[in-house]
Amino acid sequence: MAERISRAVRMGIDVGGTYTKCVAMDNETHEIIGKNQVKTTHDDKSGVAAGVVKSFQNCMRENNIAPEDVVFVAHSTTQATNAFIEGDVASVGVVGVAGGGLEGFLAKRQLALKDIVLDEKVGRMIKVYNTFIKKKMLTEDVINQNIDELLNQGSQVIVASMAFGVDSMDEEMMIHNCAEKKNVPVTMASDITKLYGLTRRTRTAAINASILPKMMMTANATESSVRAAGVTVPLMIMRGDGGVMEISEMRK
């Protein structure tokens, strides 16, 4: 039996709304050496992971790629975009923070988001719940009470947003840490963007937070599928600007 020649292979996985695709490329020549496509398995008991496993393993088997050959795996997905289109989004709870006096009065109004309409014709929207804490009252106990209140109302993810939070993120970080301890997905408004005013910053964070569960589910499913195929290199996630980051970085 002829000895198998090892090679370095880069692989890419895309989980789309209709199809899950896998492409293999020679790391040295950049030649496409294999591709595979299967239907995205939304209805499988394992979710989209089943399709990822099938496409990834098919591509490796059909092109004689061994797990040890794989030096790079990148994952991209339209699942987040599809979540908006299909209304498959999480309910958001906003924990707003501001000082007292006139500043607090104005900020409280700016922080109180209404439901975010995605498709008016069919009534698709991001449900938003709000709570407000005065900055001087901000303690771990008070934060936990407010998070619990939002969760009881139906929130699935939390947004921490403070007036002038771009100048100091300590208060938003306190809320972030409390939510993390409860294993609740959380986003800090000032971490998402520092370019906009308070309302738009909070709204942007809420939109981002609403797709966190779907995004994490897809990424985790893809990572599990890659590991099940025997590939041990870190899974890289494609960013919107064309760059990549490790899945561990994305989870942060």
Predicted regions and their residues:
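N-terminally biased helix-coil "hinge/interface" segments that flank
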Residues: 2-252
